[in-house]
Amino acid sequence: MLTLSGWITTQVPPSSRAAADAKAARTGTAEQAEDPAAGTDAADQHVQLSQAGRELAATMGVPVEEEDEDIPQELRPMVKMIRELKKKIEEKLRELQEAMRSSDPGAKEARVPELQKELQQLNSALQTATAAMASAIKEMGISDPALIMKVMGSR
């Protein structure tokens, strides 16, 4: 098992263990976690990653949109969440408008309050996320007005 920075763990297949051990010996970046002579699993290794490596690992599998490259890594998940909440709010507003135009009064009476409640919850979540974003921006000491507008506007 390979543990990176204490937060990423992956199983190393037996065929790649020798190559991983050889590379670790060459680079000196891995330490044997347990002694193979003691009868324990020799594939357990601990790897120290640089800051750049941690940032790269954090973005693995999550494509960064080109216009978001200047947004600090720590803020990207919040920006994404705010965008998703805004998108859901727009969808619910469209549903609410359709429900209000409904010719069936029974369906209208049932659906409109339900959609209004969902909109309240989404708006509350958006307010919470926006407050968390503002707090994170302040904590990080970001003062670039264009970046703040981009992050807070989140499209």
From Swiss-Prot:
Name by which UniProt lists this protein: Uncharacterized protein PA1545
Residue spans of biased composition, Low complexity class: 17-30
Chain intervals with Polar residues compositional bias: 1-14
Native source organism of the sequence: Pseudomonas aeruginosa (strain ATCC 15692 / DSM 22644 / CIP 104116 / JCM 14847 / LMG 12228 / 1C / PRS 101 / PAO1)
Region of interest (Disordered), residue spans: 1-44
